[in-house]
Amino acid sequence: KDTPAFIGNRIGIFGIQSLFHQVKEMGLTVEEVDKLTGPVIGRPKSATFRTVDVVGLDTLVHVANGIYENCPNDEAHELFKLPEFVNKMMENKWLGSKTGQGFYKKEGKDILTLDLDTLEYRANKKASFATLELTKTIEKPIDRFKVLVTGKDKAGDFYRKNFASMFQYCSNRIPEITDAFYK
């Protein structure tokens, strides 16, 4: 069925917007989110925030605003509203690679990271979680996933919240995109 923003963009933007809100709720840094959403879960090294910098924050904002306007009955409608830090980044034209700064900024040989609370760039901080340490010798992403979602630290909390909301949102999209789930 025809749906606003195509299903891939709809789910992808939901995932990123959900993360944006979760970052503030859980007090996570840009580096922590990129550590949690990169290769450890089978995604590219660019993870979340670096990928947004490459694609362009303006592109993400355009699609998110389109979903917000065109999907008024979506149960996650309010989640598609942009958080204040994204609005400030747009005002400052911190769109990512195309403007030389976004969530990350290169100064000489140094890569700086945007602090989402102060909106000031600072030196990169190494992200570390006990749960991630437990997965270092586990090769298959599905086996790592089992360890990640049972973690007893902030990373475990992050994965449980993040994946539960993503799986629920994807499941709720099924009747919207198809009447025949198994064809």
Enumerate the predicted regions with their spans.
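N-terminal glycine-rich phosphate-binding loop for ADP-containing cofactors
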Residues: 1-183
